[in-house]
Swiss-Prot record:
SMART domains named in the record: ProRS-C_1
Upper classification of the organism: Archaea, Thermoproteota, Thermoprotei, Thermoproteales, Thermoproteaceae
Gene: proS
Protein name, entry field: Proline--tRNA ligase
A single cellular component GO annotation: aminoacyl-tRNA synthetase multienzyme complex
A molecular-function term among this protein's GO annotations: proline-tRNA ligase activity
Statement: the UniProt record of this protein carries the keyword ATP-binding: yes
UniProt organism field: Pyrobaculum islandicum (strain DSM 4184 / JCM 9189 / GEO3)
């Protein structure tokens, strides 16, 4: 394999200046998703986007299955009687609920699920008898519905979240449930690592935790315009739901005890983050393991007399790669030029492109172009399979490396309000000294003009031995670093 030339990759100027406009352009032109459906916050997955989504879903399923989770499917309808049982939960979600306003004569009040804790608990109560039935680990990938009042954005803020993976686990003790919380964090790290996403892990402040949770841990990523996007959440629910639904088990000592529960969710926001993080002014680059098409072949011939020879060689290349499991496509359209095809497949994020022309056939080689860097390589047919596998691995590693470098460059510690404001304006995520007091935290948000992501869980969150003051409440000693950002 010989590097023919280094190329100048696309810039990210459009993403930095108007990310949402760029994202709409990508979804439309790459034929991933259609935003023209006439219901606010509800959109259509197109075939190419659906193939990408299925690959992500399969990744999620594989990792959950490997860690002892079992897939289920619950109804979309939840009786309001169930939904209203947990007081914090209903306060957190009631304004976002879609009601079933007409369903025949009479009948109970129903809602479309915004999340499934209150649907699952009544059934879990029937399934669990004693300690031998625990732990129970369930998950489903379904649509959930939330009547968003804020501006909706494709994949990012929706009324129908159509790829909502929610896991629900039930445990005998708090210790076992919190062990599951730690495992859930590791599960999400594995998923996001395979999506080549960089992430912060933050313990949400009390005023922003999941309704009904004792605490919430969130995964946030930083997008090119400096705003953060929440891509996954993990909730320790304690006995808040099992108490109101009377989910108990017979312990080994013969007494009945309340079970402890967790839940954790991920949605198509993760796909949005992947498309945007690896995006540029020419389109996006898909991680090779998840790309619907990993390699595209573009035949290049001049005149009808060259076509049979070129296509015969192309077919040989195609079979060679297909037979080792590589997802490959031949773009043999006659009404498009090779240059047009190059831009088209770069837009759609195909990781590798193979060009085959008459001179390549004479040398028994092909030209392979990486989407992430646009570098071109001459590869002999004899080394093609190994070279393609190697290049896909290199592309994946580079996407991951670039994402983490960008995230680390955008994280800054500051000790003054004005410095925090300036850093936020520059597209940074700031860490500021905080006492841990909720009122001071809310005031901090207002002073800086940004949202609190929470206390870092991927680094040491403590101030340590330094005598720092809470930026919003100077009379209080700071105990933690609090992350703040603008966010979607």
């Amino acid at each position: 394999m010989e590097l023919l030339r280094e190329a100048k990759p696309y810039t990210k100027d459009k993403l930095k200046t108007n990310l949402i406009e760029w994202f709409h352009w990508l979804l439309r032109e790459a034929e991933l998703y259609d935003v023209r459906y006439p219901v606010k916050g509800a959109y259509v997955w197109r075939p190419y986007g659906m193939k990408l989504r299925r690959n992500v879903e399969n990744l999620i399923r594989r990792i959950h299955d490997e860690t002892g989770h079992e897939e289920v499917l619950f109804p979309v309808f939840i009786p309001y009687e169930f939904f209203s049982k947990e007081s914090q939960h209903i306060r957190g979600f009631e304004k976002e609920v879609f009601w079933v306003s007409k369903g025949g004569e009479g009948g109970e009040r129903l809602i479309l699920r915004p999340t499934s804790e209150t649907a699952i608990m009544p059934m879990v109560k029937l399934w669990i008898q004693d300690y031998k039935d625990l732990p129970l680990r369930l998950y489903q990938i379904v649509s959930v519905f939330r009547a968003e009042t804020k501006m909706t954005h494709p994949m990012i803020r929706l009324r129908e979240i159509s790829m909502f993976k929610e896991a629900h686990t039930v445990h005998a003790t708090r210790e076992d449930a919190e062990r599951q919380i730690r495992e859930a964090v590791e599960i999400y790290k594995r998923i996001f690592d395979e999506m080549c996403l960089a992430y912060m892990i933050n313990k949400r402040p009390n005023w922003d935790k999941f309704a009904g949770a004792e605490y919430t841990i969130a995964f946030d990523t930083i997008l090119p315009d400096g705003r953060t996007l929440q891509i996954g959440t993990v909730h320790y629910l304690g006995v808040n739901f099992t108490k109101v639904f009377e989910v108990t088990y017979l312990d080994i000592d013969g007494t009945r005890k309340l079970a402890h529960t967790t839940s954790y969710g991920i949605s198509e926001r993760s796909i949005a983050a992947m498309l945007i993080t690896h995006g540029d002014d020419g389109g996006t680059t898909l991680p090779p393991k998840l790309a619907p098409i990993q390699v595209v072949i573009v035949p290049i011939f001049y005149g009808e007399e060259e076509m049979p020879t070129v296509m015969k060689f192309v077919d040989e290349v195609y079979r060679m790669l297909r037979d080792v499991g590589i997802r490959i496509h031949i773009d043999d359209r006659r009404d498009k030029t090779p240059g047009w095809k190059f831009y088209y497949w770069e837009l759609k994020g195909v990781p590798l492109r193979i060009e085959v022309g008459r001179r390549d056939i004479e040398k028994r080689q092909v030209v392979v172009t990486r989407r992430d860097t646009l570098e071109k390589y001459a590869v002999s047919l004899g080394e093609l399979v190994d070279a393609v596998k190697q290049l896909m691995s290199v592309v994946e590693d580079n996407l991951r490396k670039r994402a983490w470098e960008d995230l680390r460059n955008r994280l800054v510690k500051v000790e003054k309000v004005e410095d925090a404001k300036n850093a936020i304006r520059e597209g940074k995520v700031v860490e500021v000294p905080w006492s841990g007091d909720d009122e001071c935290g809310v005031k901090l948000q207002e002073l800086v003009g940004a949202d609190a992501l929470g206390i870092p869980m991927d680094t040491d969150p403590s101030i340590g031995g330094f005598d720092m003051r809470d930026l919003a409440c100077k009379e209080k000693r700071a105990e933690f670093w609090l992350r703040l950002s603008e966010r979607y």
